[in-house]
């Protein structure tokens, strides 16, 4: 019982967040469920506020870094494409996966979630990078890619950039 309680306290404290981030480097996350399993512990430290993470990928889609991009309130957080572009360029990444949590436990995307996904897809396309997915984590997860929405968004982003 003590081991389980200690593990839970360590998980809630964020102790494992850096371990998760470090151990994911060089790995390929092939499915939204793999992203969910890797990222769920990252949200345990502050599970009562919305936080946004970026999984930055190299040209072979291997994880270069996992970084917290923003934290907000119980129902929202704000991330600026400009700041993410700066990180993509600094890390010399070709793509990324955007991941955030919904403290309510319901992973269904909000209007703001759709809007930031479009803005990020356009911003990344404009510098020759790709937003592979945007995953929302709650009790389960929602993947914009698995829903089919991401492919259409990338097409629209490319069309806008081509103008």
Positions of PLM-derived features:
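Active-site-proximal loop/helix of nucleotide/amide-processing enzymes and allied scaffolds
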Residues: 1-17, 25, 58-60, 70, ...
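Mobile, glycine- and charge-enriched loop segments
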Residues: 27, 35-77
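Acidic-basic catalytic patches of nuclease active cores, encompassing PD-(D/E)XK
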Residues: 32
